[in-house]
Amino acid sequence: MAVATQSLEELSINAIRFLAVDAIEKAKSGHPGLPMGAAPMAFVLWNRFMRYNPKNPKWFNRDRFVLSAGHGSMLQYALLYLTGYDSVSIEDIKQFRQWESKTPGHPENFMTAGVEVTTGPLGQGIANGVGLAIAEAHLAAKFNKPDAKIVDHYTYVILGDGCNMEGVSGEAASFAGHLGLGKLIALYDDNHISIDGSTDVAFTEDVSKRFESYGWHVIHVKDGNTDLEAIHKAIEEAKAVTDKPTMIKVTTIIGYGSPNKSNTAGVHGAALGGDEVALTRQNLGWSHDPFVVPEDVLNYTRKAVERGAGYESDWNKTYADYKAKYPQEAAEFERYLSGKLADGWDKVLPSYTPEDKGLPTRKHSETCLNKLAAVLPELIGGSADLTHSNLTEIKGKGDFQKGQYQNPNIHFGVREHGMGAICNGIALHGSGLIPYGATFLIFSDYMRAPIRLSALSQAGSIWVMTHDSIGQGEDGPTHQPIETLASLRAIPNLTVIRPADGNETSGAYKVAIERAKNNAPTLLAFTRQNVPNLAGTSIDDVAKGGYIVVDTDGTPDLILIGTGSELSLCVTAAEKLKAEGKKVRVVSLAAWDLFDAQDAAYKESVLPKAVTKRLAVEAASSFGWHKYIGSEGDAVTIDRFGASAPGGVCLEKFGFSVDNVLAKAKQLLG
């Protein structure tokens, strides 16, 4: 094919392909197959349909684009460069996959303006997309008026065979179909190739029928390599279907244009090699040097800048009219978008004294959620089919269902993994919504990827985890977390808080809400069983991670360190030791990372180096505790699986009793 016969659209599509090929060749690393095969569908979408403003990547009413098949990241970087985003220059493309570049191996929303979510682990992106679409539907139902639609945008996702093999995509797609999210459109790059070769070796189901059974509208574009009009008509049709999401199956050839590697696994995840690049240039009629895009092509693709300015200008006029007619709603909408919390929001968090009835911290959590929801209507979330165990319902506010998108209570069903990724999508919508997702702490293992990605991608999700220890009881070791807290505490940028009573639960929510507004996730671990309200606990001191709950005159002989339900054991043991003339301090270490972040003087004031006799008490693994107890300390912990018995029996049998804490303390004291 000669260059002269190609239209500007065809040249633009080849520009995408060769920016990807050249960047991957220079890096000697990457995945050229998807960008080469999916370039036509991506360009038709970005050039003819998507509404966005390259000069204002955070314009609120933009359409959201998610590359769920994140390994094909050069597809997105090429699009950002060609359409005029300042975040990706040709120099950035040359630095693909290099140290501190804005073009990392997989898309990272915190590195590259124009990237909405961090993708890479396959299937996360389509589930994030469901979250983005939920956010749009919720805000539209809350704020739009018959004469003014200020929330009106689509979520587009490109996903691949690998995404569709992953369980999380099935969870999320099933849920999206149930909800009838009509502004969610997924383009499935159906190229039949995975790393191991043809997908025939492992993946032979009818994906279209599967999505139809989920309640999606399904369209098939048989030639995704050259039939641009078929792609156009499919997206047009998808937008016309408003009562259900649409999956457009676009059959493509992976590595399209490569004479010897197209339609093979060899083009999936490795550079083409110099000889094959030259042959591909010849085959596709691309005579330009590496990283060179002809001026006429750039002029054409960068018409997106003018279009985008127009889209935003039109929306600004719509919003100005809305604000004039509905000033109260506009003020609240602007508060959402600004990330500002309602004045005095934290004053609703309850405080407790020892005279108040002891309750499970999950019950205190329910109280906090409902108090907060009354002043922070941006809270939205729910449980993975454990609403009445996790106690996460916002009472009197209704369920988020098809036709009832204004309501905040989401029933995620038994879909922990999907729930996590959906919550991240809601958080990363950029509209001030605060999502929360709940399950038993042990089942955080089912959603570890999205919990980790919330921390990596700076998503302000709140993870509400109940039944946090062997105190869970009769369900037995399959449901009793042991190593779970340690593994979660190891995730960078994730704050894990295990509150001891009502005051600390209020403090935990205060931290979680503030972190959410600062684009950081928090995991809260709550008890199934009752715990007493303690005299020395503090709402505000939870933010320090660790603080003194019970103190003594002078230098302590012993420091007892506890979290959650075991803090009360420490307090009671300290009282008994005090009666025997011992000087004992009790420290709550509810959030390790928050304590670690305090200055050295504060940490020394709580855990002085001179006091080496320290005893940690936590109904979880000992892993990580030696940082705080030192080589001369000890721990009452559990480093084996639990057992099926009433929770109190489990705790007693495994040594979580005042008597055992006393015995261990006396051993340390000599």
Swiss-Prot record:
Keyword list, A-Z: Calcium, Magnesium, Metal-binding, Thiamine pyrophosphate, Transferase
Feature type site, description Important for catalytic activity: H31, H268
Cofactor binding summary note: Binds 1 Mg(2+) ion per subunit. Can also utilize other divalent metal cations, such as Ca(2+), Mn(2+) and Co(2+). Binds 1 thiamine pyrophosphate per subunit.
Keyword Calcium carried by entry: yes
Catalytic activity: D-sedoheptulose 7-phosphate + D-glyceraldehyde 3-phosphate = aldehydo-D-ribose 5-phosphate + D-xylulose 5-phosphate
Reported cofactor(s): Mg(2+); Ca(2+); Mn(2+); Co(2+)
EC numbers, comma separated: 2.2.1.1
Ligand binding (thiamine diphosphate): H71, G120, P121, L122, G162, N191, H268, F443
Binding site for Mg(2+): D161, N191, I193
Listed InterPro entries: THDP-binding, Transketo_C/PFOR_II, Transketolase-like_C_2, Transketolase-like_Pyr-bd, Transketolase_bac-like, Transketolase_BS, Transketolase_CS, Transketolase_fam
Enzyme class: transferase
GO molecular function term, any single one: metal ion binding
GO biological process: pentose-phosphate shunt
Claim: Metal-binding is one of the keywords in the record: yes
Residues reported in the UniProt entry to bind substrate: H31, H268, R362, S389, H467, D475, R528
Gene Ontology CC terms: cytosol
Active site: E416 (proton donor)
Protein family per UniProt: Belongs to the transketolase family.
Protein role: Catalyzes the transfer of a two-carbon ketol group from a ketose donor to an aldose acceptor, via a covalent intermediate with the cofactor thiamine pyrophosphate.
Protein's UniProt name: Transketolase
Annotated source species: Nostoc sp. (strain PCC 7120 / SAG 25.82 / UTEX 2576)
